[in-house]
Structures are given as C-alpha cells and as structure tokens.
Curated annotation (Swiss-Prot):
Phylogenetic classification of the source organism: Eukaryota, Metazoa, Chordata, Craniata, Vertebrata
Biased composition (Low complexity): 46-64
Entry note about domains: The Cache-like region shares similarity with the Cache domain, a well-known receptor for amino acids. It acts as a ligand-binding module that recognizes and binds glycine and taurine.
Side Cytoplasmic, residues: 440-451, 502-525, 598-611, 665-1216
Signal peptide, first to last residue: 1-23
Protein's recorded name: Metabotropic glycine receptor
Length: 1216
C-alpha cells in the first residue's frame, strides 16, 4: 500500500467520527465477571459509602476515610520504592526496585477507573480508539470478503495502527488483533503493534508470537476480558425487527457500532523491563470490533488497544471520581481541598485551604497542606500519618479570616455604651417632660410670646433628633440604617424649620417698609409653612427608601465593614452619595437661617428670643459642619464606639443647646425689671392673638432705623399710615353704628391742620426753652410758686414722689396710644364685680405711666405698682415713628376734619429735647401769656368759623353703641366744644383729671394754640348742657363708687366730667379735689376781682392762669408758674377774703344742679357762668394765644379716641 495509505486511513478515521457518535447503544446484560474483577468491584462498592460519609461536611471534624485507607495500603501492600515514586515522582528510587512482572495499582481507593475518562488529557486518546474501532466495524460488516483475505489486507491494518500514534501524542503504543474464528481459536491469527520510541514509530508484526495471548494473565487481560463479554458490547439498532428489519438497517448503513462506554480501562501500572520497573505509569484502553455471520448475527473478530503514558496526567484527590478520588486528608468541616495542577501522576498534589473563620496553627504563610519534597522517604511520612493530619482551628468570634486566635473584630466598651445610652434616655425623658411643662405654663407671658404650638413642635423635633444615638447603640442592620436617616432628617426639618420660620415671621412683621398693614403670620400659618417643608423631606425619604429596597434586590447591601488602623473589623452603615446631598441641603437651609438672623438682629422682642434663636442656628451650622466633615472623611476608620460618641456629642452640642436657649430664658426671666418689658413689646403673642395693630409703629420704626431712609420717604410713609388707620376707624364706626350720619368732606381740612400742628410740638417746646436766660428771675419765682401749690395735692393724695419726678412727668404724662383694634382687649365685667386681671394690669400700667392726680387716690398696692412701671423709669423707646420727622415739615397740607389718634411717639420724640428743661419751660410760658393778650380780639372771628365743624367732630368721635350711662357724655362733649368757642379761657376748664394724662403739665395756650383761635363765647343753653352732664355724673358716682374709681383710672375725654363734684349729694369736693380746700383764697381773689373791678378779659385770664390750677372743673390742668406780682397779690388777699370766698363757692355749688335739672337743654342757667368759673372770662395776651397752638384739640382728639374702647365699661355703669 505504501506511505500514502497512512494519511488516507487517518482521514477515514476522522470522517468516521460522526458515525461513531451516532452509534450509541444500550449495554446488554453482561456475563458474570471473572473472580478477580468481582473482587476489585466489591472493594470499590464497599468503599463508596465510606467516601460518601467522608464527604459529608455536616459530620463534625469529618475527614476523608479513603485517605486513611490509601495510606495504610501504600504502607502495607505497595513496595517502598513504588510508593515513594508514586508520592514524589523520582525515577531514581524506582530503578533500585527489582521486578519480574508489571505492577498494577489494583484495588486502590477510588471510583471505577472507567470514570477516569472524564479527565481532559485522556479525551483525545479515547476518541481516537473509538473512531478506529467503529471504522473496522463498518469495514467488516459491510464487506464479507475482508474476513477471508486477511493477508492481503495486512498493510491496511498496519496503516490503521500507525495512524493511531500519529493522531494522538499521548498514545505510546497501539496494537490490533484479528481472528476469523470468534471463540474456537485460542489465539488471534493477526497481531500487529506500533510503538513510539522518542521521535519515531516502530511497527511490529507479532502474529508469530500471538499464541501467548491464549493464556489469561494480567498482561493479556485486555484481550481475554473483551473476548469473554463481547456480547455485552453489541448493540444493533432495529434488532427487535427480525432479520428483515436488520437487513433493511444495513442497507441504510446503520449497523453495529461502539461508543466510549464500551472501552475497557486497565488500572495504572508500571512495566517491568530487564528486572526493573520502567519509569512512567501507563494505562491500557481496549475495544472490540465485530463482523456478521450469514444470518446477520454479530460475531467477535478482534481487539484494538492503546497504551497511554500517565506521567503528564494529574491525580485529582479532591474530586469525586477517577483514580485516588476523595483520598485527601483535609477536614471537610473546617478546610477545603484544592488540587495542584501540573505536577503529574503523583499523590499529595493538593492543598487544604482553611475555610472562612478557621486558621492552621503551624502555618504562618498560608493555610494549606504542603506536598512532601522529593528527598523525603514515604516510610517516614507513613509513620507519622496521624501527626500529619491537617487540622484548622477556629478564629475568634466574627473573624472571616485570621492567622491566629487573636480577635479581628473591634471589642466594644460595654460600660461606655451603657453610660451613653442611659444619659441619652434621660435627656429624652427631660425633653418629653419639657413638653408637658410648656403646656402646663401655656398661659404664661413668656410662653405666649413664643407660641405654644411652635414650642411644642420644636420639642417634638428635638425628641426625633435624640433617636440616632439610640439607633447606633445596637448592631447595624438595614432597617436601622434606614431609620437613622428618617429620624435625622425629619427631626432637623421640624426643629430648625420651625426656628427659621419664626425668624422669617419676625422679619416679615418688623422690617416691612410699607405703610399698609401686611397680613400677620400667626402660629397656624407658620405651621402650614412647616408642613410644606416636612412634606418635601418626607417625599425625599420615601424615594430614597425605595431605591435602597431596589438595591437590596440586586444584592447591594446598605451594611459594610470598616477596618481600623489596627486591622480590626467593625460593621457600619455605608455612607452613600445621598448622604452628601442631605448634608448639603441642611447646610443651605441653615445659611438661610443665618441670613434671617442677620436681618432681624436689631428687632426688639419679648425675652430676646430672636437673639437666642440666632445663637442656636449659628451653633448648629458650625457643629454640623465639623460633624459631617469628620463623618465623611473618617467613617471607614472610626469604630462603633467612636461613632457613637461622635453622634452623642453632635446631638447634645446642637439639640440640647437649642432647647436650653429657647426654654431657659423663658422660665428664668425675672419680672423685677419692668423696663425691658415696656421697652420691648411682646410682639409674638400679639401676632398669634391677631392683635398686631398696636405694634405696627414699632415695626416701621425699626425698619427706618435699620435702613436709614430719607426723611421725605418717612413722611410719605407716615401719611399713608395715618390715612389708612383713619379710614379703617371710620369704616368700623359706621359699620357698628348705622344711626350715625356720614361726615361731610368739608371737615377734612381741620383734621389735617390739627395733625400738622401736633407735629410742631417739638419745635414749639424748643423755642420756649430758648428764652431761659432772658427770664431767669421769673423762672425761679414761678417754680417756687408752682411747687407750693403742688405740695397740698401730693399730701392729700398720699403720693410720695419727689418734686423732680413730678416735674419730669409733666411733659410725658400722655397715655400710650391705643390701637384701633384694642377695644377687643377690653373684658366685660358685671356691675359691682371687680374687673378681669388683665384689665386691672392694663389700668394700673396706664395710670402709673400717665401719672395723673386721680392715681394718687388709688389704694396703696396699686400705687406702688404704678410707680414701679412708670414711664419715668422707662428708657426712651419709641413705640411708633408717627411724628419723629414730621415736625420739620413747614409746608401746610390740605385741611381735613377727621378723628385721628395720637401716639406716644409724639411726646417720646420731644422728650430728648425737653427732659432737662421742664423747669425752664415754665418761665417761658409766663412770658408767652403776657404776649397773648394782644392777639385774642383779632382771632375771635377766626375761631367762630370752626365752631360748627368742631361740634360735628365731637359728636362723631363719641362711642357709637353707648348705653344710658354714656348718654350724658355726648352733650357734655358738645357743650365743652361750644364753651371753648364762647370764651377762650374755657379751654383750661375743658380737661378733666383723666385728661391730665395729656396736659396736666402744659398750659392750653402753650401746647395747642389753635384751640385759643377756636374759642368764642357761646349762648347760655350750652352752659346748661355742661351742668346737666355734671349732675348726672355726680349721681352716678354717688350710686356706684366703683364706677367712679373706674372712671378715674382712665382718661376722660372732656374737662367737664369733674364738675360733678359740685353737687351737694355727691362726694365732698375736698375728697375729690383736696387741693381746692387749700386754694380757696386764690379762687375768692379771682371772683372778687371780677365783681368789683372791670378788668380786661385778656389780662384777667393771664393773671388767673398763672396764679392757680383750675378747681372743680379744671383740676390739675394748669400747673403753670405765675409772675412775681401775681403771686404776692394772691398772698395778701388770701387772708382777707377767705370767708367770703367759701360762702360764694358753696352758693355756686348749689346752683350747678339747679341748672342741670332744667328740662330744656337750651334754657338759660340760673347763675351766670362768671360766678361758677370766674377765671374763664380772663382774656390771655395775644402772643400767648399765638404760641400756644397744640394741646386742647389734641386732648379732645385723644378723648374722642379713648372714648371708643370704653363702650363696655359705660354700659356696665348704666346698669349700676
């Protein structure tokens, strides 16, 4: 055939690869195995349960039983040199052993050798043998003539054997046997063999020596074993169809074929050559091929075998199949067997790797079982098999990997953590108790000033901010890490959101530059804004929690492990990018709070709460910045104890400090210093109660002082403010009093003129003080005379104020302006019952601040309280900026008659100029009166023009829903206004002791000079109205003394209210006006001068107004100092005419109720007015009338303003 036959045969084998794959068959029932094979199989089946139990990791300290059996067999049955060669692979030791036949490793532990086919290095040889066998089956079964001419086809068989070695390098030898008689012939007829010798292949024809195959030995087992059980390897598709079906299958080229399962594997063996073992372990693979009988029955024809060199095949003792499978010495419960690749056919090529949580005590580099070196003898290792057992010891608790038994996890300080959690629980309990205490003292002024709901909200948010420390006390888990973010963000948004919104409310109310009243921010509105903030935070937390749950489904955990510098491990909640975003959001929110703190830094407030909130916001900003920096930078290296202490320190440096700043000042505030209470109004309580109107002036003042606006802008703003306040008051009065007629537009001019004159008070006072040097002598005598007249009044009233204090309180005895909306604050009370506590406090404060003479007759405790909170001890804090810069405006505005309100700022702005000049002003007033005598005749005509408008103004300014007890007050006001027009001197008698809160230290001509212009003599019926009012008021005082005291505690709108003391049935005149008893001589002197001599009206008024204060009707209003001449004249005439004056006074007192009892209001009086009040017919000088422009109209306006809030009190008096 030649050389070309070998490649051709090899190609045929490759083409037949697919046919061999198709010929899969079921294995037929086998014949009984020979005794040797049965013994080997029995041993293998007996060892399988042992291996199964050894591989069970649940058995405690379980170890491979096959490893122990293998060691024992190698020590007992295997020759020493062979066992050493098997462990080391050293061929020098193998050459020293003598042999007579080959040595097989039969009966060794491990599963069936047939399963060794799974080894990757044997797949090539196995496939080549299977393809060659199937090729012979096809050739012999398809052509019967091939069996008859063996010698002719001998070259084809040689080419087939040679192709096996050339096709697979791992095959070292291949052979084929052929026999025409299946069982009758004891030996095969043809025996061909090919051997690989280094780089060449040797072909041999051993047919002549094939007779030795007839003997069944270990060396011929590959042939006899297949010959005996050839039927078990047969498989023919369609054999159940009979001969016809079988022939049909052959026509379709579907015949008998073999597969890999039909290949017979021999145990590994060593060949014996020349009395010694040849180095290299071999294994024999053999397969039979078949022909067909004439009846198409398969018949055995021969065997093909290949010998494979195993020196490059690794032994896997860790696997579950193959040679020496499961013979490792690793303990399966604490270690893992890992084979070592590339070492060849040697034992011990594996490592025992300790499992997680275990370590090897004698191995410091890595935890494994090292294979013994080539210089070590097997016997030495066999002797200490028990000592070589690989044992892994457990690590410390929680350690996944370790090299020794030292702890790898951070050991927590239990006592430290217990102390922290105990203190945290105490703080949370105190926080909860603080909520109860705040609710318990919810009616306290300090709590109402801040708002109960807002304080409770801050405390609840602080309780949430205390929870992170409690969460970090426990072992981290996914739920705890999620809950940690929830309580932190919700608590932060609740606490500092509320604080920031409170600051925002202060900024909105106090720093508004508009004159229009903005809608105040109540506690409910702040809570609604806070709800929006919490809703945003809640929505973010829901989204973040959803993303965390989705990451858990992707096996992305929220729990991680950190490692300290000492390589100790601890569990922690991982820091995500969302944590950086939340920290940035907190920082930006606090920056907004810092801006608000800066904006409201100058705003006055009750208990300085914005100042403490600003400290809390700045503290949170700084501490949180440090906390987040440490947390983000050192989070992976801070163990659980340090992280717990970090959160603990951050919580108490921010939350606890915030609570302390908000609560401690409220409960530790002392009420002994009322100066701060008066100077800094409790604005937040007013805002929450919806009564912010009285503090609008303060907000505008603060805004102007903050931004330093131009004076023109201030004037424009104030004009808008007063105009809108007037419109609102008019609308409210018309709404509540539909019976009142609307005012005419022609009356608006007078109101605007009066307002502009009011604003000129500071300049008037400053001009009066400029004449101090000129009138020095007169000032000293006037001051002494005024002090002499005031002492009896102070003695009768029980007042102990020094003379300096009374002089200082003259100018500033005006009552603080009442807001249009403060009538709501009046609380009703039944007849005869004491008023409410809040009403008493308000009355006490008003009377003490005003310093009226009526306050001198009050009980001692109320008087002391009044002195404590008097405005004499209050710093100059302007409650509004109503007229600070309007005084410089010289341009007269359009006239307008409207009921305006006076504010305390009118006097507060002038106090800086006049506080030290109170005594000096008196001398200037005396000089001005002398000059006013010349101007009166010329201005009487001017005063008559405004008489009608003043009448209408007085009627409209009366309280709308007055009861029966207030009906006398309307004609009283109307009559008094007409008296002012009838006689200029009547202006001094138009102020009651209640009205002295505004002008007890000022002369009418000095403060309100336009009132002098408006005064003109009126008809007689006007006097009857005054007398009627006096008699009714006196009867009311007689029937209800409580009502009389109540009337004294508030400013009366007109001076005629005290004329009721002239009634014989009323209280004695000395009790109401004690100074009258000591000043009768002065009164008699004036009366005598009127009746005996015809004194000009202007000069008489100048003298009387300088000599004494008005008695009965005008008590306490004129405390001006007279000139020296008038004073000396008074002293001389007091001694001579005292008796006659007392008689005339009593007669005049009896005539007053007679005129009151008149049925017609326009009936002429029974006595002339000169007999009752002779000093009113004295005419002041013209210069005095010109200079005194400010006060009577303003006092009338103040009376009109104050009359509104007293409807309820007058209604009660009517019931009495």
């Amino acid at each position: 055939m030649g050389v070309m036959a070998y490649p051709f045969l090899f190609c045929l084998l490759l083409v037949h690869f697919g046919l061999g794959a198709i010929g899969a068959s079921r294995e037929a029932p086998s014949r009984p195995d020979p005794p040797r094979e049965r013994t080997l199989r029995a041993k293998q089946h007996a060892q399988q349960p042992a291996r199964a139990s050894a591989s069970d990791p649940s058995a405690p300290w379980s170890r491979s039983t096959d490893g122990t059996i293998l060691a024992q067999k190698l020590a007992e049955e295997v020759p020493m040199d062979v066992a050493s060669y098997l462990y080391t692979g050293d061929s020098h030791k193998l050459k020293r052993a003598n042999c007579s036949s080959r040595y097989e490793l039969a009966g060794l532990p491990g599963k069936s050798p047939a399963l060794a086919s799974s080894h990757p290095s044997l797949h090539g040889a196995l496939d080549t043998l299977t393809h060659a066998t199937n090729f012979l089956n096809m050739m012999l079964q398809s052509n019967k003539s091939r069996e008859q001419n063996l010698q002719d086809d001998l070259e084809w068989y040689q080419a087939l054997v040679r192709s096996l070695l050339e096709g697979e390098p791992s095959i070292s030898r291949a052979a084929i046997t052929f026999s025409t008689e299946s069982l009758s012939a004891p030996a095969p007829q043809v025996f061909l063999q090919a051997t690989r010798e280094e780089s060449r292949i040797l072909l041999q024809d051993l047919s002549s020596s094939a007779h030795h195959l007839a003997n069944a030995t270990l060396e011929t087992e590959w042939f006899h074993g297949l010959r005996r059980k050839w039927r078990t390897h047969l498989h023919r598709r369609g054999s159940n169809q009979g001969p016809r079906g079988l022939g049909h299958s052959w026509r379709r080229r579907d015949g008998l074929s073999g597969d890999k399962s039909h290949v017979k594997w021999s145990p590994p063996y060593l060949e014996c050559e020349n009395g010694s073992y040849k180095p290299g372990w071999l294994v024999t693979l053999s397969a039979a091929f078949y022909g067909l009988q004439p009846n198409l029955v398969p018949e055995f024809r021969g065997v093909m075998k290949v010998d494979i060199n195993l020196q490059k095949v690794d032994i896997d003792q860790c696997s579950s199949d193959g040679w020496f499978s499961g013979t490792h010495k690793c303990h399966l419960n604490n270690s893992e067997c890992m084979p070592i690749k590339g070492l060849g056919f040697v034992l011990g090529a594996y490592q025992c790797i300790c499992k997680a949580g275990f370590y090897h005590p004698r191995d410091f580099s890595f935890n494994n079982f090292q294979r013994r070196g080539p210089d070590h003898h097997f016997v030495e290792s066999a002797k200490d098999v028990s000592e070589e057992v690989h044992v892994c010891l457990p690590c410390s608790e929680g350690c996944p990997y370790c090299a020794d038994d030292s702890p790898c996890f951070v050991q927590e300080d239990k006592y430290l953590r217990l102390a922290i959690i105990s203190f945290q629980a105490l703080c949370m309990l105190l926080d909860f108790l603080s909520m109860l205490v705040v609710y318990r003292f919810r009616k306290a002024k300090s709590i109402r000033a801040s708002g109960l709901i807002l304080l409770e909200t801050i405390l609840f948010g602080s309780l949430l901010l205390y929870f992170p420390v409690v969460i970090l006390y426990f072992e981290p888990s996914t739920f705890r890490c999620i809950l940690l973010r929830w309580v932190r963000l919700l608590g932060f948004a609740t606490v500092y959101g509320t604080v920031t919104l409170k600051l925002h409310r202060v900024l909105k109310v106090f720093l508004s530059r508009t004159a229009q009243r903005i809608p105040y921010m109540t506690g409910g509105r702040v809570m609604r804004m806070l709800a929006v903030i919490l809703l945003v935070v809640f929505w973010f937390l829901v989204g973040w929690t959803s993303s965390v749950c989705q990451n858990l489904e992707r096996h992305i955990s929220l729990i991680g492990q950190g490692r300290t510098s000492d390589h100790l491990i601890f569990s922690m909640c991982l820091v995500e990018r969302w944590d950086y975003m939340t920290a940035a959001a907190e920082f930006l929110f606090l920056l907004w709070g810092v801006y608000l703190c800066y904006a409201v830094r100058t705003v006055p407030s009750a208990f300085h709460e914005p100042r403490y909130m600003a400290v809390a916001v700045h503290n949170e900003l700084i501490i949180s910045a440090i906390f987040h920096t440490i947390r983000f930078v050192l989070a992976s290296r801070l163990q659980s104890d340090w992280m717990l202490m970090l959160y603990f320190a951050h919580t108490h440096l921010t939350v606890t400090v915030t609570i302390g700043l908000l609560l401690i000042p409220k409960f530790s505030h002392s009420s002994n210093n009322p100066r701060d209470d008066i100077a800094t109004e409790a604005y937040e309580d007013e805002l929450d109660m919806g009564r912010s109107g009285s503090y609008l002036n303060s907000s505008i003042n603060s805004a102007w002082s903050e931004h330093s606006l131009d004076p023109e802008d201030i004037r424009d703003e104030l004009k808008k403010l007063y105009a809108q306040l007037e419109i609102y008051k008019r609308k409210k009065m018309i709404t509540n009093n539909p019976h009142l007629q609307k005012k005419r537009c022609s009356k608006k001019g007078l109101g605007r003129s009066i307002m502009r004159r009011i604003t000129e008070i500071p300049e008037t006072v400053s001009r009066q003080c400029s004449k101090e040097d000129k009138d020095g002598g007169e000032h000293g005598s006037a001051k002494g005379s005024s002090a002499g007249r005031k002492n009896p009044q102070e003695t009768a009233g029980g007042s102990g104020k020094p003379k300096e204090e009374s002089l200082r309180s003259r100018v500033f005895s005006l009552k603080k302006s009442h807001s249009t909306y403060e009538h709501v604050r009046e609380q009703p009370g039944g007849p005869g019952s004491p008023p409410a506590q809040s009403r008493e406090e308000e009355e006490a404060t008003d009377n003490s601040v005003l310093g009226s003479p009526v306050g001198a007759n009050r009980p001692r405790p109320l008087q002391e309280d009044s002195q404590a909170v008097s405005t004499e001890s209050v710093p100059l804090v302007c409650k509004s900026a109503s007229a600070h810069n309007l005084s410089s405006e010289k341009k007269p505005g359009p006239t307008r008659t409207s009921v305006l309100q006076k504010s305390l700022s009118v006097i507060a702005s002038a106090k800086e100029k006049t506080l030290g000049l109170a005594g000096k002003t008196q001398a200037a007033c005396v000089e001005e009166r002398a000059k006013a005598q010349k101007a009166l005749p010329r201005e009487r005509e001017t005063n008559r023009k405004y008489s009608n408008s003043d009448n209408a103004e007085t009627q409209d300014s009366a309280p709308p829903n007055s009861s029966h007890s207030e009906e006398p007050r309307k004609p009283q006001k109307l009559g008094i206004m007409k008296q002012q027009r009838a006689n200029p001197t009547t202006a001094n008698s138009d102020l009651s002791p209640g009205a002295t809160h505004m002008k007890d230290n000022f002369d009418i001509g000095e403060v309100c000079p336009w009132e002098i212009y408006d005064l003109a003599p009126g008809p007689g019926p006007l006097e009857s109205k005054v007398q009627k009012h006096v008699s009714i008021a006196a009867s009311e005082m007689e029937r209800n003394p409580t009502f009389s005291l109540k009337e004294k505690s508030h400013p009366k709108p007109k001076a005629a209210d005290l004329c009721q003391q002239s009634n014989p049935k009323s209280v004695d005149k000395a009790e109401v006006c004690p100074w009258e008893s000591q000043g009768q001589s002065l009164f008699e002197e004036e009366k005598y001068l009127m009746s005996k001599t015809q004194v000009p009206l202007g000069r008489a008024q100048g003298e009387n107004s300088g000599q004494h204060c008005a008695t009965g009707v005008c008590a306490g209003q004129c405390e001006e100092l007279p000139p020296k001449a008038v004073a000396s004249k008074v002293e001389n005439e007091n001694l001579n005419q005292l008796g006659e004056q007392e008689k005339k006074t009593s007669s005049s007192e009896r005539n007053v109720p007679d005129s009151h009892n008149s049925s017609n209001n326009f009936q002429p009086p029974l006595m002339s007015r000169a007999e009752v009040c002779p000093w009113e017919f004295e005419t002041p000088d013209k210069p005095n009338a010109e200079r005194s422009v400010a006060f009577p109209a303003s006092s009338a306006l103040s009376a009109n303003k104050i009359a509104g809030p007293r409807n309820e009190e007058v209604r009660l008096a009517r019931k009495v």
